Amino acid sequence: MESIGVVAPHTMHFAEPLRLQSGSVLGNYQLVVETYGELNAARSNAVLVCHALNASHHVAGVYADDPRSTGWWDNMVGPGKPLDTNRFFVIGVNNLGSCFGSTGPMSIDPATGTPYGARFPVVTVEDWVHAQARVADAFGIERFAAVMGGSLGGMQALAWSLLYPERVAHCIDIASTPKLSAQNIAFNEVARSAILSDPDFHGGDYYAHGVKPRRGLRVARMIGHITYLSDDDMAEKFGRALRRADGALDAYNFNFDVEFEVESYLRYQGDKFADYFDANTYLLITRALDYFDPAKAFNGNLSAALAHTKAKYLVASFTTDWRFAPARSREIVKALLDNRRSVSYAEIDAPHGHDAFLLDDARYHNLVRAYYERIAEEVGA
């Protein structure tokens, strides 16, 4: 299957203030967007793809100035791919608070003329959805054929079906959860603590000091990355292999430098992440994850929370995902069935843990492809 090829983002400016769930108000904000495919005359073939923690609007394709800049879901979105851009008009939106061009902590605060830094207001999944709805309005899209996402993106897809039930025909929720467990909140807290305790954090105003809390970001990413992989996958990739080429059991250095391949891998992932991601953004997005809990307003009753939804659903989980385990997806399915909603559920046997939603797995992709075939028939795409 061919790639979608060279793509380019564009920036959308919004003058109407956006009131956030916290009560703060953002005015004159911008969102970076990428689109793929063509919007049909009826504007009925639009699909919104929502991104996870460290991703962005760049869902598919490559940038002309960097042939290595492949979109984060390029194996899923493109001509002839499960989400076929020959049939659907796909939108990727970089969320508020991110560090890839949309208004966030790195943006200039018009009140001070300096970056917002830690002054940028806390945002929630619901805030992102309301901002995305304004993007849809700008395109003249009254109803999405589907809203789709994995992990945190799946939470946004679910929130869309709750907040805008008339505007979502299908919700595709992959490797997600209706709320974070105490363990997941704990992982996020440890990661945030690594950043907050970095001497280069400077209370979030490190931009003015010309530094970056790299050490904290590195540790935060290492913690997170462990939770994205399964134990079996890590055993297969690394086992107890030493970094030394001969792998000799007597090749220990007897110090605290890197000894094992898995240590080297985690440090590499941490360094790479610290190069391109922003610490304040990491704090914001992990807190948005913590706060997401649509059942909270219904005394913890998810069935009651989903009672007014109107979309049809595809919910998928992966057997070795322990970050957002299949049981969490089954909670969503049960709540939908309690309300007699149309829902398809698949629990995919895959060894790759939470990150499986990003990988090219034939069973997984065939499932998504078949579901989009159904949507295409409905909208005449």
UniProtKB/Swiss-Prot annotation:
The active site is at S151 (nucleophile), D321, H354. This is Homoserine O-succinyltransferase. GO terms for cellular component: cytoplasm. Pathway: Amino-acid biosynthesis; L-methionine biosynthesis via de novo pathway; O-succinyl-L-homoserine from L-homoserine: step 1/1. Its EC number is 2.3.1.46. Homodimer. Residues 45-360 form the AB hydrolase-1 domain. The record marks R323 as: Important for acyl-CoA specificity. It is found in: Cytoplasm. Keywords: Acyltransferase, Amino-acid biosynthesis, Cytoplasm, Methionine biosynthesis, Transferase. Belongs to the AB hydrolase superfamily. MetX family. SUPFAM superfamilies: alpha/beta-Hydrolases. One of its GO terms (biological process) is methionine biosynthetic process. It is an enzyme of class 2 (transferase). Pfam families: Abhydrolase_1. One of its GO terms (molecular function) is homoserine O-succinyltransferase activity. Disulfide bonds: none annotated. It catalyses: L-homoserine + succinyl-CoA = O-succinyl-L-homoserine + CoA. Its main location: cytoplasm. Transfers a succinyl group from succinyl-CoA to L-homoserine, forming succinyl-L-homoserine. Substrate binds at R221, D355.
